[in-house]
Amino acid sequence: MNRIFQRMKQVAPMLLFATLSVHAQKSPQDMNRFIDNLMKKMTLEEKIGQLNLPVTGEITTGQAKSSDISARIKRGEVGGLFNLKGVARIKDVQELAVKESRLGIPLLFGMDVIHGYETIFPIPLGLSCTWDMKAIEESARIAAIEASADGISWTFSPMVDVSRDPRWGRVSEGSGEDPFLGAEIAKAMVRGYQGGQMKRNDEIMACVKHFALYGASEAGRDYNTVDMSRQRMFNEYMLPYQAAVDAGVGSVMASIN
């Protein structure tokens, strides 16, 4: 139980900070103090609940208020929703969390904003061929402006998996086989999405993905295992992840399954 609590103490602040910092103007010290005080009030179930991200792409206002997800939100068992968009719908669901849950913790609303939102840009593999970091950053900036206007606060991008096996069906989601290029693009996209580190309403939180080394899945099979040496891991696959973290990415995909 103590180990679970310690893990929640590490992870939950990131989720809570991400939720609140998208629209907040508080200093990091004030925010840390606010989160510490809030976590002292949370039950273990509520802390674990912050790790839940149900998929609700087709949810409507009426369904949201009568569904099991709605009950879970009210109990503080949901940290965010995936694939729900539209300001009106998001507002109604957010009110469930803020007004009807015990602690009023707002939800995150995440979506795969991969290469544009309303304005569609070339796929990431295509963008990488330009080697134009300014244009790539601008594409992420535009996507953030459009997505945030529709209520989205979190994108599962950039995808920084180094991909060298064309049999893998997700090669087009990343920047290809070059670790250096992947690292430069990772930094550019994090800057584009997050801008001034999510201090404005038109900036959204980026999530570097997928779980490290996923681009080297055995035989190019999706969701397969990876087997490689530590030398190869650090020299060929980890550079883009490190670059995204150094650029201040707001979240990291901790698993892919």
Please give the residue ranges for each predicted region.
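Helix-centric, low-specificity signal for extended rod-like, repetitive segments
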Residues: 2-3, 18, 40, 202
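Intrinsically disordered, low-complexity regions
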Residues: 1-2, 17, 50, 104
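Hydrophobic h-region of N-terminal signal peptides that target proteins for export
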Residues: 14-24
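Compositionally biased, low-structure terminal segments
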Residues: 6, 17-18, 122, 163
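Glycoside hydrolase catalytic-domain context in secreted enzymes
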Residues: 24-257
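Bacterial N-terminal signal peptides that target proteins for export
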Residues: 1-12
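Terminal low-complexity, poorly structured segments
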Residues: 11-12, 16, 47
